Amino acid sequence: MPVGGMRIIDRIITVMRPIFDELIVVTNIPSAYQGLDVTFTNDTFTTRCSMTGLHAGLKAIKNKKAFVVGCDAPFIKTEMIKALLRFDHPDVDVTVPSTQAGLEPLFAIYSRSCLNIIAQHLLQGRYKVSDVYSRLRVKTVDERYLRKADPDLISFFNVNTPDLISKAETISLRMDTQA
């Protein structure tokens, strides 16, 4: 899906490529993303949701941890990712932003050690990502620190409704004008 003339997945990869040595896209239709220099994996559970995507992505990583972002976030910022990485610690399973709107589980750092607990939740039909947090070591990062990297927290904006897609186009035009 394009925003500002560029597919969201391409926007995300452009930001993440200089930061990470391993990029994984969870999709059941890899042909839709031909030409991308990424590793593809697919869901191992039949239910399609963020939690199954998280599980598949963590299962595919070679590293101990992964930065995870939803593929509907067109405005992620390098500075925001780096800010979150600075707060991550080897002794935590999840490093997640916390804002007035709540937690941002689809813009977070996850350890491979989360896999079993995520799988248990999926097998129980529990699909909300943040529900696993009570069974994990979680580090929350307050928005006052994150706003230093992304004052408007635009990195958390996602486009999962037609109205939000329209709003994203407006934001993209504004950002292009300011650049």
Give short role names for the model-derived ranges.
Residues 1-126, 131-153, 169-176:
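Nucleotide and nucleotide-moiety/phosphate-recognizing core
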Residues 156-159:
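Conserved anion/nucleotide-ligand pocket segment
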Residues 164-165:
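Catalytic donor/gating beta->alpha subdomain of glycosyltransferases that bind UDP-sugars
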